[in-house]
Each structure stands twice: as C-alpha cells, then as structure tokens.
C-alpha cells in the first residue's frame, strides 16, 4: 500500500480497488481476475462480518486470512500479493453497549486483526455508544481512534510495522447502508476533513503515537457517491474539487466508500481527484446474484421439473422466513418487499448465500447445468455480455466461468479507473 500511495502522490494515475466481501466466489473472482497481472489485490473484512467473536460469517480475523489464502492457493494467486484490510474497526458492532465496554471489545478487535496479519487498518470510532451523545464530538472520535491505534501498535511486530497502514475518518452516513431512498448526498467539506486530520494528529501525539502517524495513509470522506435500493448518486467531479486540492497539501490520499455502481469513467475521475482507494462490495455480490438468477432461469427451461433446484423459490422462502438481514432496510408492502429482496442494489441477499438451504439449492443448480449443453441462444438471452465473449473465444459456456465473468464485469470498470 505504501508504494502505491507514494506513486500516486508522485503524480502517477494509480489507485486500488478494495474488495469488501466474504463470499468465496467473489474473492475467487478478484484473485483470478488479477492472477496474470503484477497488481496486488486488496481484500477487506468489516468488523460486523469478521471479529474476535466470529461476526456474522462465523470467522475470526485469523480464520478469514486462512479462508482467503486457501482460495488464493486454489486459483494460483501468490499470497504475498494479497493485502488484507479491516474496515470500520471500532465500536460499530457494540453500539448498544456503554462506551467503556464497547471500546474494550474494540481494542481486542484491532489486536486480533493485526495479530492475524492484516496490514490496512481503518480506525473508526465515529459511532455513538449507549451512553454517548449523538453525534460524538470530533475530539472524542479522535481520542478513541488513538486508543485503537495504540492497541494495534502494541501487538505489531517490527516486521509488521513496516507494512502497517492506518485509515482514519468515516463517510456519511455511518456504516450500515441507506435504509430509505436518497435524492442527494452531503459531500465532505474541506474544513471537516482538515478537522478530522487535526484532531487525530493531536490525539495520537498525546498518546505517544507520533511515529504511528506516519503510517496514516488515507482519510475517509464522502466525495458525493452513494446508492440505495434503486437510486445511484453519480460522482460529479466539479463538486469535489475543493477536497481534491486540499489533500494535495498532505502525504495522504482519500478512501471513498460506497463507490458501487459508478461508471468506469467516474472511477477514473475519482482516482484522478485523489480518491485513490475505492471500496466496492454490494456491486460484486449483485453481479453474482444476477449470474445465479440468470442460470436459474436457464435451468428452469433445460431441466425436468422433478430435478430442478428451485433456487429462486428457495431464496425467496428463506428470506421471507428469516427477514432479520433485510427487514429494516426494505419497503414494507409484500410486493415491494419481494422486488427489493430480489433486485435491490443494496443486495441484502448477500447475507443469505451461506444459508444451508440456499447453498444446497445453488449447488444443485450448478450440477444440473454442468450436465447439459447450454444453448448459445439462452446465454445471449440471459447473459448477453458473456455471449459476446463466448463468440470471440474468450470464455466457455461453463456455469462457473459464466459467474466469474459476470463478477469480472464489475472489476473491469475498477481496473479502468485505477490502472496507471
């Protein structure tokens, strides 16, 4: 990361896409996509996804590292080319607890990530806990971030410190996703970004972390990109020029969250304007979902009724029976809920892929389709871009390859934006 940031600050057009997903097919696609390049791949886990208690994936940071490395070994991607990051490390998971208890857990969270070899650490203590004011004072946020940084430094080996990097600040809104329709988004003001940096510098120095400050490579801001269930706020470069000019006076770059669904030209503009770390998550699993839905439609026509996976019906049944991952985000009417469950850009389905019933139905569908020849006309109907690549000899009509290439479509846009 340090080399990439140095190259960007030296004037090169270079950035990096941060893959924020724990789905094995998404991680496989991210690694296979860059297998034959010289680029490093940045894969990040969030604090609610992966933590010392297992998170919703059931994985600790060490488990997640081994999970990613096993996929890398399978696809032939060198482990040393993987950068592991921890996103929103702080009290995010424990906001319902008092601040002291939440911060104790946050300290252990950061230590677990660093001990597991994660080298990009987002110190985010911006969220209010049960006994806090809303919002937190910037000084309190910075003080807590310094406590988390001290925890990271206390367990890092000398070798790890050479690779260790910190990201500070947070976007608006705080992590969790948009629960209602968006019409516009508040772009971070220069004075707010400057105050974030200033308060963190002061808090770090007060705790004897002056050297650790040199490892702060990025600040999270909102450049004016966001999405909800069916709306996308697109990057307007002219509205972010004050931010772009301010960061040039520092040794840092920006990290932009929620960059999913932007155009490839927008990614290039974002990197040009020093938003050099572009986070993506739901767009990748949305592409996965599109591919699985397309294959399910193909299966519906090619496989006898008694042998079909019922994949789409199973997904719907499970999500309606167990609505905890989508209920507070999606619309309440039955028909509206079904549309959101299936097609929302927020892609809450991503929380359900590990469910045993859904996992088994997808596996059945894949086995069914691997045993038949899929007519080209059906691929043209349901996966038109993949049809074109089959026609040009770049791709085979194999279900797994079709899913991979669908995810590659998202990664291709980021490569265009980030490539030197």
Curated annotation (Swiss-Prot):
The lineage of its organism: Bacteria, Pseudomonadati, Pseudomonadota, Gammaproteobacteria, Enterobacterales. Coiled coil: none annotated. Component of the tagatose-1,6-bisphosphate aldolase GatYZ that is required for full activity and stability of the Y subunit. Could have a chaperone-like function for the proper and stable folding of GatY. When expressed alone, GatZ does not show any aldolase activity. Is involved in the catabolism of galactitol. The keyword Acetylation does not apply. NCBIfam families: agaZ_gatZ, PRK15052.1. Pathway: Carbohydrate metabolism; D-tagatose 6-phosphate degradation; D-glyceraldehyde 3-phosphate and glycerone phosphate from D-tagatose 6-phosphate: step 2/2. Belongs to the GatZ/KbaZ family. GatZ subfamily. PANTHER family: D-TAGATOSE-1,6-BISPHOSPHATE ALDOLASE SUBUNIT GATZ, N-ACETYLGALACTOSAMINE PERMEASE II COMPONENT-RELATED. The keyword Cell membrane does not apply. GO terms for cellular component: plasma membrane. It comes from the Bacteria. Disulfide bonds: none annotated. Pfam families: GatZ_KbaZ-like. One of its GO terms (biological process) is phosphoenolpyruvate-dependent sugar phosphotransferase system. This is D-tagatose-1,6-bisphosphate aldolase subunit GatZ. HAMAP family: Tagatose_aldol_GatZ. SUPFAM superfamilies: Aldolase. Forms a complex with GatY. InterPro entries: Aldolase_TIM, GatZ/KbaZ-like, GatZ_KbaZ_carbometab, TagBP_ald_GatZ. Keywords: Galactitol metabolism. The gene is gatZ.
């Amino acid at each position: 990361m340090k080399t990439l940031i140095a190259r960007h600050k030296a004037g090169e057009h270079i950035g990096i896409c941060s893959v924020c997903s724990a789905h094995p097919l998404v991680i496989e696609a991210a690694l296979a996509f860059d297998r034959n390049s010289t680029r490093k791949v940045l894969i990040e886990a969030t604090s609610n996804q992966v933590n010392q208690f297992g998170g919703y994936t059931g994985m600790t940071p060490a488990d997640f590292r081994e999970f990613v490395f096993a996929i890398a070994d399978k696809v032939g991607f060198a482990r040393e080319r993987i950068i592991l990051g921890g996103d929103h490390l702080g009290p995010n998971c424990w906001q319902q607890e008092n601040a002291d208890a939440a911060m104790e857990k946050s300290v252990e969270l950061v230590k677990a990530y660093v001990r597991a070899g994660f080298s990009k650490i987002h110190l985010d203590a911006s969220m209010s806990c049960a006994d806090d004011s809303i919002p937190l004072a910037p000084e309190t946020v910075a003080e807590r971030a310094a406590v988390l940084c001290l925890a990271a430094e206390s367990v890092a080996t000398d070798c790890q410190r050479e690779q260790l990097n910190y990201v500070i600040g947070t976007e608006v809104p705080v992590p969790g996703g948009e629960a209602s329709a968006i019409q516009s988004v508040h772009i971070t003001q220069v004075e707010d970004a400057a105050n974030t940096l200033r308060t963190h510098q002061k808090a770090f120095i007060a705790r004897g972390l002056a050297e650790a400050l040199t490892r702060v490579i990025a600040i999270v801001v909102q450049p004016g990109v966001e999405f909800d269930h069916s709306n996308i706020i697109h990057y307007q470069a002219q509205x972010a020029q004050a931010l772009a000019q301010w960061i040039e006076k520092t040794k840092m770059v920006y990290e932009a969250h929620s960059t999913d669904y932007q155009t490839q030209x927008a990614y290039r503009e974002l990197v040009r304007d020093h938003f050099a770390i572009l986070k993506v998550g739901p767009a990748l699993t949305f592409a996965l979902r599109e591919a699985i839905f397309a294959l399910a439609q193909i299966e519906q026509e090619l496989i006898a009724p008694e042998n079909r996976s019922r994949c789409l019906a199973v997904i719907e049944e499970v999500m309606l029976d167990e609505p905890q991952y989508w209920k507070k985000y999606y619309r309440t009417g039955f028909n509206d809920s079904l549309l959101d469950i299936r097609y929302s850009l927020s892609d809450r389905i991503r929380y359900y892929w590990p469910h045993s019933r859904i996992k088994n139905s997808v596996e059945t569908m894949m086995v069914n389709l691997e045993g038949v020849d899929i007519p080209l006309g059906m691929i043209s109907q349901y996966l038109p871009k993949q049809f074109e690549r089959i026609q040009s000899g770049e791709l085979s009509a194999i279900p797994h390859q079709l899913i991979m290439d669908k995810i590659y479509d998202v990664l291709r846009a980021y490569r265009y934006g980030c490539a030197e």
